[in-house]
Amino acid sequence: MNTRPDEALRAALGSADASVRLQAALSAGTYPNDAYVDVLVDRCAVEADFFVRDMLTWALTRHPADLTVPRLTVETTSAVPQARSQAFHSLSKVGDPRGWAAVTESAIQDADESVARASWRAGVILVPVGQEGEVATMLSTQLGRGDRDVQLSLARALAELGDHAVPALRAARIHPSAGVRAHALAIERLIEDPDDYFDEAIFEAMRIVTRQGEPDGTPDGTPDSTPDSQRDPRPEGTE
């Protein structure tokens, strides 16, 4: 009895040999079959090898978006973190605007950092024209979150929105957390100068925030632009 193509693919993707799984994913993308979509999405949730996962996503982009986008959208609500993160990653690669429906506040605030970061990236790629400010506002709720890599991911996402992100970033200038304020200032700097380095931008932003003290030294949280050379070195309250 002949084995169905989707069953053969599932068996190959279940091999203990990563090279076999990689070849199976490559073949599934080279010779698309509608029956492969569920198999590919299911495998994304458990695949341990980065290169195989990347090939699985590529294979999904080779299939009709009418099939992949609805299936991936459902997968973004899976109980398995890897399933959610890979679904967002795949949606961003498919690039179909219908995938925007999966980018919710709960996804952007996902407790799993890999899921959150994937949803941030998907959000800036899939956001409909005219709703860039909306996604910027959602992303700004994550300012100050996580370690350097997480903050860099958010910075890249917001910087990609360009001027659309500026109102949300400026609103964060009066946030009670110094870390949030510094992160926002650093991203504004990156938007103004895309060639700047994140580490330098965040260092300078922290310097400004620290100098302002708690609470901010200016009513609206705007950085004090007075050059150090022009500052009065005497302590406040002295003549």
Model-found features: residue ranges?
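Alpha-helical adaptor scaffolds
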Residues: P81, H89, K93, E105, ...
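Conserved hydrophobic register position within alpha-solenoid helical repeats
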Residues: A24, L56, A87, S119, ...
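N-terminal alpha-helical scaffold/docking segments in eukaryotic complex subunits
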Residues: M1-V52, R62, A171-I174, A182-E239
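TPR/TPR-like alpha-solenoid helical repeat scaffolds
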Residues: L56, K93, A157-E160, A184-D193
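Short inter-helical turns and helix N-cap capping residues of alpha-solenoid HEAT/ARM repeat scaffolds
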Residues: A16-D17, A48-D49, A79-V80, A111-D112, ...
